[in-house]
Swiss-Prot record:
Keyword Flavoprotein in record: no
PANTHER family membership: DNA-DIRECTED RNA POLYMERASE I SUBUNIT 2
Subcellular location field: Plastid, Chloroplast
NCBIfam families: PRK00405.1
UniProt-listed InterPro entries: DNA-dir_RNA_pol_bsu_ext_1_sf, DNA-dir_RNA_pol_su2, DNA-dir_RNAP_su2_dom, DNA-dir_RNAP_su2_hyb_sf, RNA_pol_bsu_bac, RNA_pol_bsu_CS, RNA_pol_bsu_protrusion, RNA_pol_Rpb2_2
SUPFAM superfamilies: beta and beta-prime subunits of DNA dependent RNA-polymerase (SSF64484)
GO molecular function, one term: DNA binding
Key words, A-Z: Chloroplast, DNA-directed RNA polymerase, Nucleotidyltransferase, Plastid, Transcription, Transferase
UniProt subunit comment: In plastids the minimal PEP RNA polymerase catalytic core is composed of four subunits: alpha, beta, beta', and beta''. When a (nuclear-encoded) sigma factor is associated with the core the holoenzyme is formed, which can initiate transcription.
UniProt name for this protein: DNA-directed RNA polymerase subunit beta
Length: 1072
């Protein structure tokens, strides 16, 4: 697709556009395609016919708003109606009714779905494109074996291979292979037709012996031979019509369905002209594939690169939703058939509405969004995370690879990724290279290809007819694309004579006159995360990868601040995330408060509600703050309210703080960070977190559970925050152990469940004491905070399957503390090791104390020098009150451009502020600073500046854990693992060696017995500790040893052990 003029040349497409386009394609095309496959349904006697008039389908307006769907834990969906007809063939009577097919979840303005009140997103999957691929592999003798692989639309594979004697075999499974002549005969060709339609008939005749002639003597023989190999059946099967139909269905229709994309690819690869609507493998395809394979054997033709993007396709949200819709219609068809036959059997008169149930479609989509690996809960840590999540690209999932089986070649960067898939942004760990991110300019083409725009350079471009062209990966090899050229579109600027360029997957240096296309934007090759890193060209790629991942983990702060040094993409990232409120047209602000903005324009008055302390699924606080004043006039597109982590419509994930790169008493050893107490007391890095606690009331066999504030046997101060209904009051401050919701569960009354005083009351006074069990919702450890919302969701019907749900939301204010993780935008991460009083921090020559001290040894070995440029330029920007937005790769315009920019700005800041220490020519960028404890200057000059530092979601409050008592595993009798289960720390093999090395025998014995799995000994410890007695050494073996003995017994091995007495060394036999 070509676009005339410079329109859109520097306009970045919406970051959620790919999701929107995919869903629109599903609604406009996918639904109709699947409806057209729905067959006419007849009963067994062919008296009644049921059909859908699919041209008249309707999608109704959603019954609830997005916000209500989230609040009430419902699905934001639309009801699908279609006209259905029931025809009685005997009298040609027809009954038409509009039937309700089911609910289809709708995409909202964020490009996500709301299912059961939870934001979910569908990830794009990248798969091998259906078609035919030629490869060469070495066999065990080191001889090249040429194979052609035919991949079907659903991922099934069939292979043709040619051996040393030029015989061609068809391999339908890994073990079984048959002659290609048998396959072609089974597909309906005779020998004469085969030989007439191939280029090398003599090769086919060369491996035709008497045995082969007998196999392909008739179509029946060929089908029997093929069925025997394909179905792996023994004996001699007999030819029958049912066998022929089974083979036709299982192999030729299922295994060999190419789909529209597969048919197009095979036509292009084999130079065929078969119509696109013929989506199954034909004998003509197999003959052409065999001819190409023979050509490969003798050195003609080119092999295919399986990892080239032209051989991949994107399975977008449209394809996944369409597949599920087709599956639901198949289920609906089976249900209608069953209902029709049941109605006729019981002599009932069916109607279309009685035949169609909505459960097929609704349950299919519910299970898809709930269980499918490509449907994920939207990560809403911050606005950047939301938009990046929708642009992920996964090789995993159904039909793809797995993290354990994927080869290095699949994970690696390929030249065809240039401008399409970001070479930097991928996950770390086992899925590295398998989960990528789309570059910012790409779009998904009609055939599932990834297209990227380039600016065309032609003779006509001199006549002001510049064009932008979207290039698919299959067309790359026809063009020379300039890679490192400057982006000036002004014709007057003379381009370099020689430029680096890309041609046929190689990077060359060519003359400017030979270039066909040039890149349109410096960020064109990167994803959003990588495009937000300033001076990325000065960083090692591994650190840039860490940075793009860590920006997604940044916590929105209570007082956001935009970065001094940025890349210019911050505004669009904030805009497309949907967290800000933007004026849709110009008008006047009538009133504004924290809850809503009343805005008049175009003759209408709009009430715009603002998000107030909304919890994200990562427990961060999503909040909108009005940015306009009453009575002000606003223009279209102006920011009315900022969201979490945005300032003035720009992304603001962190804070600009004064940093120094120097060692300080070992407190910044191994990436630790030393910070000033100013960051705590001035709420610089304070963030709000909202935790959700919920409880359900069920209908038990003894009666319903009750919500009440009258709970026996509990101290009054634990119930102090409950209202008369037994639910915590809004605005209450709650501590660990407090009751949030009081609940009593009825249980069977038996004598053993009564306390002694209850039995006395019942015997003397005849008072019936309640036997309900207390099952209240208590605040767990680390949950203290302020109650900001309570929701009581009462489902209709109130049955045991639809329990009432009570949710309590508690707001926590968290200052930065020792153990929290902070990071810059260059992969420079660290843990807070010490918080110093501000008077002890190093201070500058004007007396300003430093906020953070980083280790200078973290820079040279990691090669992320971009942080040094950002740090120094940030200092200049702070002193000059300027903000910089710098595109990457500025060295393309001038050598050392970044360094010159930074030094010139520092020099100007030094002149304007009359502070010569800001830029000292002897050590530019560095300055002499003073020790806050002694007032003496440090020996060497230190690099100081303003860096943009983020606080990450990995906080010590969520990680720190100690176990006093807790649960034990049933088999090993050892403490469980993990903070959530109140687990313990494992003393493993290597820890035991370490303790042995120090000779601490008693500590080691305690860890392996009392504190772990010696059941009797650990019970005795408590009693002896309370009375102050001595803890006796256990004389029998711990449970883990007894478990080993029992496991050996199961293998018929008896193991006895003996304990040697310390007194007389007599051996006492002890049974295990």
């Amino acid at each position: 697709m070509l676009r005339d003029g410079n329109e859109g040349m520097f306009t970045i497409p919406g970051f959620s556009q790919i999701q929107f386009e995919g869903f629109c394609r599903f609604i406009n095309q996918g639904l109709m395609e699947e409806f057209n496959k729905f067959p006419k349904i007849e009963d067994t006697d062919q008296e009644i016919e049921f059909k859908l008039f699919v041209e008249t389908y309707q999608l109704a307006e959603p019954l609830i708003k997005e916000r209500d769907a989230v609040y009430e834990s419902l699905t934001y969906s639309s009801e699908l109606y279609v006209l259905a007809g029931l025809i009685w063939k005997t009298n040609r009577d027809m009954k038409e009714q509009t039937v309700f097919i089911g609910n289809i979840p709708l995409m909202n303005s964020l490009g996500t779905f709301i299912v059961n009140g939870i934001y979910r997103i569908v990830i794009n999957q990248i798969l091998q494109s259906p078609g035919i691929y030629y490869r060469s592999e070495l066999d065990h003798n080191g001889i090249s074996v040429y194979t052609s692989t035919i991949i079907s639309d659903w991922g099934g594979r069939s292979e043709l291979e040619i051996d040393r004697k030029a015989r061609i075999w068809a391999r339908v499974s890994r073990k079984q292979k048959i002659s290609i002549l048998v396959l072609l005969s089974a597909m309906g060709l005779n020998l004469r037709e085969i030989l007439d339609n191939v280029c090398y008939p003599e090769i086919f005749l060369s491996f035709l012996n008497d045995k082969e002639k007998k196999k392909i003597g008739s179509k029946e023989n060929a089908i029997l031979e093929f069925y025997q190999q394909f179905a792996c059946v023994g004996g001699d099967p007999v030819f029958s019509e049912s066998l022929c139909k089974e083979l036709q269905k299982k192999f030729f229709q299922q295994r060999c369905e190419l789909g529209r994309i597969g048919r197009r690819n095979i036509n292009q690869r084999l130079n065929l002209d078969i119509p696109h609507n013929n989506t199954f493998l034909l004998p003509r395809d197999v003959l052409a594939a065999a001819d190409h394979l023979i050509g490969m054997k003798f050195g003609m033709g080119t092999l295919d690169d399986m990892n080239h993007l032209k051989n991949k396709r994107i399975r977008s949200v449209a394809d996944l939703l369409q597949d599920q819709f087709g599956l639901a219609l198949v289920r609906l068809e089976n249900a209608v058939r069953g209902t029709i036959s049941g109605a006729i059997r019981h002599k009932l008169i069916p109607t279309p509405q009685n035949l169609v149930t909505s459960t097929s479609l609704t349950t299919t989509y519910e299970s898809f969004f709930g269980l499918h690996p490509l449907s994920q809960v939207l990560d809403r840590t911050n606005p950047l995370t939301q938009i990046v999540h929708g642009r992920k690209l996964s090789y995993l999932g159904p039909g793809g690879v797995t993290g354990r089986t994927a080869s290095f070649r699949i994970r690696d960067i390929h030249p065809s990724h240039y401008g399409r898939i970001c070479p930097i942004d991928t996950s770390e760990g086992i899925n590295v290279g398998l989960i990528g991110s789309l570059a910012i300019h790409v779009r998904i083409g009609h055939w599932g290809s990834i297209e990227t725009p380039f600016y065309e350079i032609s003779e006509r471009s001199k006549e002001k007819e510049a064009r932008m062209i979207y290039l698919s990966p299959s067309r790359d090899e026809y063009y020379m694309i300039a890679a490192g050229n400057s982006l000036a579109l002004n014709r007057g600027i003379q381009e370099e004579q020689v430029v680096p360029a890309r041609y046929r997957q190689e990077f060359l240096t060519i003359a400017w006159e030979q270039v066909h296309l040039r890149s349109i934007f410096p960020f064109q090759y990167f994803s959003i995360g990588a495009s937000l890193i300033p001076f990325i060209e000065h960083n090692d790629a591994n650190r840039a990868l860490m940075s793009s991942n860590m920006q997604r983990q940044a916590v929105p702060l209570s007082r956001s601040e935009k970065c001094i040094v940025g890349t210019g993409l911050e505004r669009q990232a904030a805009l497309d995330s949907g967290v800000s409120v933007i004026a849709e047209h110009e008008g006047k602000v009538i009133s504004t408060d924290t809850h809503q903005i009343v805005f008049s324009g175009n003759g209408n008055t709009l009430n715009i509600p603002l998000v107030m302390y909304q919890r994200s699924n990562k427990n961060t606080c999503m909040h909108q703050k009005p940015q306009v004043q009453r009575g002000k006039y606003v223009k279209k597109g102006q920011i009315l309210a900022d969201g979490a982590a945005t300032v003035g419509g720009e992304l603001a994930l962190g804070k600009n703080v004064l940093v120094a790169y120097m060692p300080w008493e070992g407190y910044n050893f191994e990436d630790a960070v030393l910070i000033s107490e100013r960051l705590v007391y001035s709420d610089i890095y304070t963030s709000f977190h909202i935790r959700k606690y919920e409880i359900q009331t069920h209908m038990t066999s003894q009666g319903p559970e009750r919500i009440t504030n009258e709970i026996p046997h509990l101290e009054a101060h634990l119930l102090r925050n409950l209202d008369r209904n037994g639910i915590v009051m809004l605005g209450s401050w709650v501590e660990t152990g407090d009751i949030l919701v009081g609940k009593l569960t009825p249980q069977i009354a038996n004598e053993s469940s009564y306390a002694p005083e209850d039995r006395l009351l019942r015997a003397i006074l005849g008072i019936q004491v309640s036997t309900a069990k207390e099952t209240s919702l208590k605040l767990p450890i680390g949950g203290r905070g302020r109650v900001i919302d309570v929701r009581w969701i009462q489902k209709k019907g109130g049955s045991s399957y639809n329990p009432e749900i009570i949710r309590v939301y508690i707001l926590q204010k968290r200052e930065i503390k020792v153990g929290d993780k902070v990071a810059g935008r260059h992969g420079n991460k660290g843990i807070i090791s010490k918080i110093l009083p501000r008077q002890d921090m190093p201070y500058l020559q004007d007396g300003t104390p430093v906020d953070m001290v980083f280790n200078p040894l973290g820079v040279p070995s990691r090669m992320n020098v971009g942080q040094i440029f950002e740090c120094s330029l940030g200092l200049a920007g702070d002193l000059l009150n300027r903000h910089y937005r710098i595109a990457p790769f500025d060295e393309r315009y001038e050598q050392e451009a970044s360094r010159k920019l930074v030094f010139s700005e520092l020099y100007e800041a030094s002149k304007q502020t009359k502070n010569p220490w800001v830029f000292e020519p002897e050590y530019p960028g560095k300055s002499k600073i003073f020790d806050g404890r002694t007032g003496d200057p440090f020996e060497q000059a230190v690099l100081i500046g303003k860096s943009y530092i983020l606080k990450l979601i990995h906080q010590v409050d969520d990680k720190i854990h100690g176990r006093s008592s807790g649960h034990y595993a049933l088999v090993t009798q050892q403490p469980l693992r993990g903070r959530a289960k109140q687990g313990g720390q494992r003393v493993g093999e290597m820890e035991v060696w370490a303790l042995e090395g120090f000779g601490v025998a008693h500590i080691l014995q305690e860890m392996l017995t009392y504190k772990s799995d010696h059941i009797r000994a650990r019970q005795e410890v408590l009693g002896t500790t309370i009375i102050g007695g001595t803890i006796v050494n256990p004389e029998d073996a711990p449970e883990s040893f007894r478990l080993l003995v029992r496991e050996l017994r199961s293998l018929a091995l008896e193991l006895n052990h003996f304990l040697v007495s310390e007194k007389n060394f007599q051996i006492n036999r002890k049974e295990a």
